[in-house]
Amino acid sequence: LLPILFISVIVPVSHSKVVVFDQVTTVQTPIKIRVLTRGGFFSEGGRMVDIYLDNNLLKKILTGGDGYGYLKYTSRGPGLKKITARSNTDSASGRILVLNDNEKAIIIDTEGAFKDTVFSDEFRESSQKAVTSLSENYKIIYLSRFLGKGITGIWLEKQNFPKSVILRWRGPKTLENLKKNSVQLHAIIGSSDVISAAKEQIEKRFSFEKTKDGKTVKDWDEILKLLQSPLSHPKRNDYSDEGE
């Protein structure tokens, strides 16, 4: 029911012929930028793709037979980076969230944490204000279980939520990959199923649903009281980034 309700209140998303996957890492921790080229609904390999970081060309890559292409990337400075992939007349963008070693992240399962916003303008407003407040002290990582990055991103932007990455939820493996990149996971907010899957990875787990594997909260104000604490961010300098 929830995915249908979400789709009914936002603009439908077309199927792009190029896909850029959002990622999260830390300064000086290498990752592989991942793109996918498609022909209609199916993967289409063997295409040249130009990869740009904030409109600066990093490198040209060739996608494999499965349509996927990769580029090793190491960020020398923190921030939310824009990655654009262009192949012929097709293009798409994604984001890479880069954290300093002392920065902490809060994960938000969008379908689980924001489901009541479909029915209540008041809850939608309180959700937006709470996440914006949390983003002043923590980095926000959004999860999408069913709808995908495109639909979720349009909805978040429409509701003026803080900009950040949107990761596809793949169970505990998603959290393991984040920790492998040295990302400090401070808390997770979402459905009872998601926080149950996170019980071995994240200590602070909150849900608006009944759960035995975390704390059930009544509203976003309660979450703010439990999570809001000062976090000093180091002064950011200008760094150059590199792709290999």
Predicted regions and their residues:
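Fold-independent oxyanion-binding glycine-rich loops
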Residues: I51, T110, S191-S192
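C-terminal cap/substrate-recognition subdomain and adjoining C-terminal extension
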Residues: L147-E244
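Beta-strand-enriched, solvent-exposed domains that form extended recognition/catalytic surfaces
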Residues: V13-E103
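Bacterial N-terminal signal peptides
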Residues: L2-V9
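Short alpha-helical interface patches
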Residues: N56, K81-R86, G112, I223, ...
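Solvent-exposed, well-ordered amphipathic alpha-helical segments
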Residues: V11, S43-R47, L53-N55, T84, ...
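Generic structural hydrophobic/aromatic packing signal, biased to beta-strands
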Residues: V35, I51, A85, I96, ...
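Conserved, compact domain cores that house catalytic/ligand-binding motifs in diverse enzymes
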Residues: N102-V183
